[in-house]
Amino acid sequence: TTEIYTLSLHDALPISGPLNKGLYGKALSKKIWDLKVINIRDSAEDKHKTVDDTPFGGGNGMLLKPDVLAKSIDQNINIGERIFYLSPKGKKFDQKIAKDLVKEKYINLICGHFEGIDERILSTRNIEEISIGDFILSGGETAAFVMIDSILRLLPGVIGNEMSKKDESFENSLLEYPQYTKPLIWDKKSVPDVLLSGDHAKIKDWRLSQSEAITRDRR
């Protein structure tokens, strides 16, 4: 059985309906695959179940807190399993990656919300950033559905040998820079000093250089 875990801010994947019907539904009943939805809020320890905070260095929006997300991961995902964070600045998801993931017994998908997540969680939990395209969604659940759909149709016993190939191109643009939120020091890793300097010009230059480096590396 291929086990797919989605970490979300919902108790159920909002658009999972089609996965329970048709060929996928039959494959689900045959235990060829299974879907488990984990609510990240369940790992928040305060009474308000807070999962987000403001970014260091200023900026719009909120970020998912690394301590809460790390706890959710550690409680539900085994060490060594591949973990993907659905992000516009991630590596582009394609058919080649889908075919590669079919070989995995466990596929873990973090559905992003707000402006993103604290950069430190990516390295400490070996999370791979992945994107379904150069556009913005209101939440990562839709992107997770796209990945799940693409992977399921390749599983033996689901749709036989039928496969599709898709070749897309995107506009060249800079990807987002790393972001950080509280706590200041987490898992022995600190926020970059420039974001604490209060020098908006330096922060702007740092973010630009980071974006350029990430874009060169990933696009």
Locate the predicted segments by residue:
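Gly/Ser/Thr-rich beta-alpha loop segments that engage phosphate groups in nucleotides
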Residues: 60-63, 92, 114, 118, ...
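Hydrophobic/aromatic beta-strand patches that form the interior of the parallel beta-sheet core
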Residues: 36-38, 84, 107-109, 128-130
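Short, small-residue-biased leader/transition segments that mark boundaries at the very start
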Residues: 1-13
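Short His-Asn-centered micro-motif
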Residues: 12, 86-88, 110-113, 133, ...
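S-adenosyl-L-methionine/SAH cofactor-binding core of RNA-modifying enzymes
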Residues: 63-113, 118-119
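N-terminal nucleotide/polyanion-binding subdomain common to many enzyme families
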Residues: 14-74, 196, 200-217
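Internal, active-site/partner-interface "lid" segment
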Residues: 142, 154-193
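Structured adenosyl-cofactor binding patch, chiefly the S-adenosyl-L-methionine
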Residues: 121-163, 168
